[in-house]
Curated annotation (Swiss-Prot):
It comes from Arabidopsis thaliana. The lineage of its organism: Eukaryota, Viridiplantae, Streptophyta, Embryophyta, Tracheophyta. Its main location: secreted. This is Peroxidase 30. Residues 141-165 are annotated as: Disordered. CDD domains: secretory_peroxidase (cd00693). One of its GO terms (molecular function) is lactoperoxidase activity. Removal of H(2)O(2), oxidation of toxic reductants, biosynthesis and degradation of lignin, suberization, auxin catabolism, response to environmental stresses such as wounding, pathogen attack and oxidative stress. These functions might be dependent on each isozyme/isoform in each plant tissue. Ca(2+) 2 binds at residues 195, 247, 250, 255. PANTHER family: PEROXIDASE 25-RELATED. One of its GO terms (biological process) is response to oxidative stress. GO terms for cellular component: cytoplasm; extracellular region; nucleus; plant-type cell wall; plasmodesma. The record marks 65 as: Transition state stabilizer.
Length: 329
């Protein structure tokens, strides 16, 4: 009798495990996840991008940056979009204070809610808009499997601790990327998104005027480039508003020129310069520069798809928010 009871318990355990495994496999991200529940979802997003990105081409960079910042905090769950009246949400953290595109994503969400209420997650909207925005700038496309669910927790401190700041050295970059399951090649390739977009002198002034107690100017910065910035752009330590192109002369084209600038010590951020301080990442950069744009596009797309899978919530985990900015919607 005891043996039979033990056998029955063992069978129950095995069946429970198998059911759990089955549910887990069913809950994974998949291509065309909304094919039945909201068949036009991806077209609605793509059309909105195409209809608006040409009037505001500078929006492509913020949308891909938003995807990056979302995935690095609690996974790709749309929590970066949540508003907080107490100022404690992810978007209140220093790395996100200059983040743009919140209203753009909210408008797409409103369009989808009219057609398919409570169906398409904010997390999926971020992932799809990032891809479609890059394509609109002439960059690569990549597969975006969908089925992400939205998180309801958005924490300022977690964002501060997990999003790599522009002042990061190589050790910090490696650690923060590793925490998300991303390797050194991913680090270099995802940094390639700096080929589009702009920043401000606030992100550069310390490198130009107040780098350390012993050195005023960052020695890793090309001296001619620094002199040009001081003369024509960031004319004082207090200039926080002047716009700087991430990839001067090519900031609206998705290409390899960012890596060429990094090799010339003309990357805007300390984190850009940090990529050349490690032999492994330096080799990846040189291989990219000496290769074709097609090869770069393919590799970048692979890393973007990999990042888009970081710690996603699927199946019964998470929720589908009706308003991306409201945690309890």
């Amino acid at each position: 009798m005891k043996t039979m009871t033990q056998l029955n318990i063992a069978v129950v355990v095995v069946v429970t495990v198998l059911i759990g495994m089955l549910r887990s496999s069913e809950a994974q991200l998949q291509m065309n996840f909304y094919a039945k529940s909201c068949p036009n979802a991806e077209k609605i997003i793509s059309d909105h991008i195409q209809n608006h990105i040409h009037n505001g081409p500078s929006l492509a960079a913020p949308l891909i940056r938003m995807h990056f910042h979302d995935c690095f905090v609690r996974g790709c769950d749309g929590s970066v979009l949540i508003n907080s009246t107490s100022g404690n949400a992810e978007r209140d953290a220093p790395p996100n204070l200059t983040l743009r595109g919140f209203g753009f994503v909210e408008r797409i969400k409103a369009l989808l809610e009219k057609v398919c209420p409570k169906t398409v997650s904010c997390a999926d909207i971020i992932a799809l808009t990032a891809r479609d925005a890059v394509v609109a700038t002439g960059g690569p496309s990549w597969s975006v499997p969908t089925g992400r669910r939205d998180g309801r927790i958005s924490n300022k401190t977690e964002a501060t601790n997990n999003i790599p700041p522009p002042t990061s050295n190589f050790t910090t970059l490696q650690r923060l990327f590793k925490n998300q399951g991303l390797n050194l090649k991913d680090l270099v390739l995802l940094s390639g998104a700096h080929t589009i977009g702009v920043s401000h002198c606030s992100s550069m002034n310390t490198r130009l005027y107040n780098f350390s107690t012993t050195v005023k100017q960052d020695p890793s910065l090309d001296s001619q480039y620094a002199a040009n910035l001081k003369a024509n752009k960031c004319k004082s330590l207090n200039d926080n508003s002047t716009i700087l192109e991430m990839d001067p002369g090519s900031s609206r084209s998705f290409d390899l020129s960012y890596y060429r600038l990094v090799l010339k010590r003309r990357g805007l951020f300390q984190s850009d310069s940090a990529l050349t301080t490690n032999s492994a990442t330096l080799k990846v950069i040189n291989d990219l520069v000496n290769g074709s744009e097609k090869k770069f596009f393919k590799a970048f797309a692979k890393s973007m798809e990999k990042m888009g899978r970081v710690k996603v919530k699927t199946g019964s985990a998470g929720v589908i928010r009706t308003r991306c900015s409201v945690a309890g919607s």
